[in-house]
Amino acid sequence: YSAMEEDDCFYGFGEKAGLLNKNKAFLRERATDAMGYDAEKMDTLYKHIPFYIRLRRATRKAVGVYYNNFYESVFNMGCEKSNYWPRYTYWQADGGDIDLFLLAGGSIRRVVDNYTLLTGRPALLPKRALGYQGSSMYYPELEKDSDDAVLDFIDTIKEEGFPIDGFHL
């Protein structure tokens, strides 16, 4: 449990639908194949990362919180109210250790820099990986001719002169 201010901003948590600021959100961390998901309201998608940045709006100061635990878990980012306690957040996991890292920095940029120092930074990708990589849940859900729809889309992109390096379904 952690105390929070009413207007604190919370960013991160991996791939999540909805608003970028997760203040007053309840988030589940688990890897799920979310076919046909709701882009505004659905929670669990493919990439769950138990890391968030809290930005204190009044001071514009940021801190990162990383739980090195990949069991299924939940984050409550102030969506509960108590008659006995001020506003709070909490994290709860189904197992494992509490391996908690608090990442100082003051600004979001510095917190992200410290997070990547801790978790590692990616190597420079090959040029082909930096181009357009298309993906959509739209095509597999078509009632018929989904393969033709994908090929038509790729042909249209090529006709427009837009480079495409891959398309994933």
Segment roles from a protein language model:
Residues 163-169:
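Aromatic- and carboxylate-enriched substrate-binding clefts and catalytic-loop regions
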